């Protein structure tokens, strides 16, 4: 997806897949606890099923946490961050991205304000899919989004 967009923009000096690998979550990382139990337990459960996929998910969240640190450094005291996230399902386990976002910013001196939950407007994906490619075995896709609001102390 990212590569095709770059071709259209004339920025296609990388091989297909190279850009995706360089973006957030594009590489693999050893699965290690963050110290945030809701995410740690889900990652451990995914790791028991598919260590390669767990490694990719771990890398995404490590880089996501790093991006939150970068944003936190730019926000002034009493400033707010508002992140719209979805809690996707991997290997049958829902990732608590909304809670992880709040926790990540709390580690950077923010206080949690609230989370607004709403249906995803104009959803273009089916409400269920079959990630295992086994007939009849379907799981729900994301149908809610979370607007997580925090304030810098």
Language model region names:
Residues 1-83, 87-153:
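Class I S-adenosyl-L-methionine-dependent methyltransferase catalytic core
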């Amino acid at each position: 997806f990212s590569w095709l967009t770059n071709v259209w923009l004339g920025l296609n000096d990388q091989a297909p897949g190279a850009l995706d690998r360089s973006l957030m979550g594009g590489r693999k990382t050893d699965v290690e606890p963050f110290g945030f139990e809701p995410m740690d337990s889900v990652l451990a459960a995914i790791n028991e099923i598919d260590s390669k996929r767990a490694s990719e998910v771990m890398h995404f969240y490590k880089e996501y946490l790093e991006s939150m640190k970068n944003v936190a450094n730019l926000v002034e005291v009493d400033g707010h961050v508002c992140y719209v996230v979805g809690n996707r399902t991997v290997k049958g386990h829902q990732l608590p991205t909304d809670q992880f976002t709040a926790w990540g910013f709390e580690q950077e001196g923010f206080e949690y304000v609230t989370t607004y939950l709403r249906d995803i407007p104009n959803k273009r994906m089916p409400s269920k899919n079959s990630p295992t490619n086994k007939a009849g075995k379907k799981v729900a896709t994301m149908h809610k989004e979370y607007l997580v609001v925090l304030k810098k102390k």
